[in-house]
Amino acid sequence: MQTQILERMESDVRTYSRSFPVVFTKARNARLTDEEGREYIDFLAGAGTLNYGHNNPHLKQALLDYIDSDGIVHGLDFWTAAKRDYLETLEEVILKPRGLDYKVHLPGPTGTNAVEAAIRLARVAKGRHNIVSFTNGFHGVTMGALATTGNRKFREATGGVPTQAASFMPFDGYLGSSTDTLDYFEKLLGDKSGGLDVPAAVIVETVQGEGGINVAGLEWLKRLESICRANDILLIIDDIQAGCGRTGKFFSFEHAGITPDIVTNSKSLSGYGLPFAHVLMRPELDKWKPGQYNGTFRGFNLAFATAAAAMRKYWSDDTFERDVQRKARIVEERFGKIAAWLSENGIEASERGRGLMRGIDVGSGDIADKITHQAFENGLIIETSGQDGEVVKCLCPLTIPDEDLVEGLDILETSTKQAFS
């Protein structure tokens, strides 16, 4: 295995190649193959970017057909047939069946582009600067998004430039299960001497992926929406990792029955791992002047083609949604079993998550690392999350075959016992 050029030339900022130090050559659905021919089951899926699996054949064919037709690849924000098809599909397959009416902003290819656009739009629309985000939240590493990201590791990497115009509130459960953290937020909003500038918007993940699979309760989300409405504050749902079916619904906020003012999507939005993001906004919030927020890659037509194909294939009825929820119950049960075994053997652990966005909190980054390293040796790719990397985190493809899902869970259970027997 030749890695010298990779180790010598790629920046030290790299991470995943340190955890999984092999050279991969190909992938299909939930399996990756390295250059020595060894297969691995993938419980990482591009950190939630490959909800429909690696090289999904249906989406691959849509991509090949589009390329073969000499379709527009790069067109800035020109009107193209691919864009029209994408917007029509988004409206007819996703938005209208859910009673949602949004305009679409295409800000650039990444999730952090979408977050930057969302928070800037909120400031323009409301004429206020402050944005409220939550403890353990992750929204990106460009300066505006970073200001709303809680993890100190990312916030320290600014060269001394301060992050500004954001205030942090405790996420659901941050102060224990008996405390409703929104009491504190609501108290500050009502106190003119509380020190909190009335925000333009609140940005929140319904399930915090990088923060440790912290799940916002449905009633908590409903109350958050009510507080925002009562105080003329926009509600932004960052659905970049939790969206596109990851929690069992296309939008993760559907479980709570709320209607955000602004939604950010990326990661699995293209369906094929192509860089793609959009911002959904209530029509009356579209305060942009032409060209006021732009980017060279703000309309990736290859991603339009695969995203539309994914929506038609998987979201035209509830068959796929029900299958994701069925698989989620399998993972939940097995994670609960693994957590129980750890607790019985002196390592306090608990299962958490929603849909196929699940984790096992083992209380220590060192313990979680031992489990994931052993799992990799046994042929499973799975990562950790949380402020100290203490949560073993599963983001397997939603399309994973049952036999691969069960085999991956078997590997994880065996690896856990091997690491601590």
Swiss-Prot record:
Annotated Gene3D superfamilies: Aspartate Aminotransferase, domain 1, Type I PLP-dependent aspartate aminotransferase-like (Major domain)
Transferase recorded as keyword: yes
Keywords associated with the record: Aminotransferase, Pyridoxal phosphate, Transferase
Enzyme Commission number: 2.6.1.76
SUPFAM superfamilies registered for this protein in UniProt: PLP-dependent transferases
pH dependence of activity: Optimum pH is 8.6-8.7.
N6-(pyridoxal phosphate)lysine sites (modified residues): K267
Name of the top EC class for this enzyme: transferase
Catalytic temperature dependence: Optimum temperature is 25 degrees Celsius.
Protein name (Swiss-Prot/TrEMBL): Diaminobutyrate--2-oxoglutarate transaminase
Record organism: Halomonas elongata (strain ATCC 33173 / DSM 2581 / NBRC 15536 / NCIMB 2198 / 1H9)
